């Protein structure tokens, strides 16, 4: 077990938990009474924490992001689809998003169980992430409400979706191979067969509310070290590099019929399989015409420094105040109680209906 893994895990959990308690709890009323302002304030605080998370794993743990492929735009409404190699793809993709997309407007589709994780899960609720039950009727309603919410607030989300539904392990690969055999299709080695029903519905809903500029197809690869789960991170088994290959597809180029969207997704995943096969042979993506445009790295490094200073001061101050200031302890307990109560009744997401009604006044 390396010290980097312990320090990274502690600081990530400490900052997200107490940041949620002291910064996000006071913003919850704005979600109801001032939806646009509430969303903006929440996004600023989540963005500041995401910067800190990237600083920790890039600067403390030595992870390097390598990005290539098509140019993308940070002011577009995007559906980002990516292969799910490890349980930490969603975290490492921050490195791509901060350099190419909009980290403030970045949302993730995650498993429902994650929203109830004390601290980090509560922060994810406030971030506006989509939590899906794998109950189709329930999930359809959740997805529809989320896009109506973004539409009412004139908000341009960039949403990460993992069509495979889970990360690549020996067990999930066996299930994917079984599916392939049953359906007479080729088994994959480097990706899982995508579950296209959710993907098709995302595309449909984004079109319906006119929040659909492009699909960003991200292929992620780990040439050295693949941290599969939380224990790998705790042990300090971080990837030396995370490679992202980007293909941008204009919304107008995506088929309109549900059947053709299904076939399009299957085709994209077959291309991913072939691309990753070559990647793991050569330890890099081969790019004929690299059009990617990265943001100024010096500005990003300045943001990292700011985030590090901000969260370091906050964490030290919080530690001292929790010891010596009873009112701070009572506020922390009150905040925890609020999040436990809200989570028990569906989480921040249940406020979406109220937000939709309130947001009508801003249209």
Cite the ranges covered by each PLM segment.
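Tryptophan-centered motif/residue detector
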Residues: 49, 90, 108, 136, ...
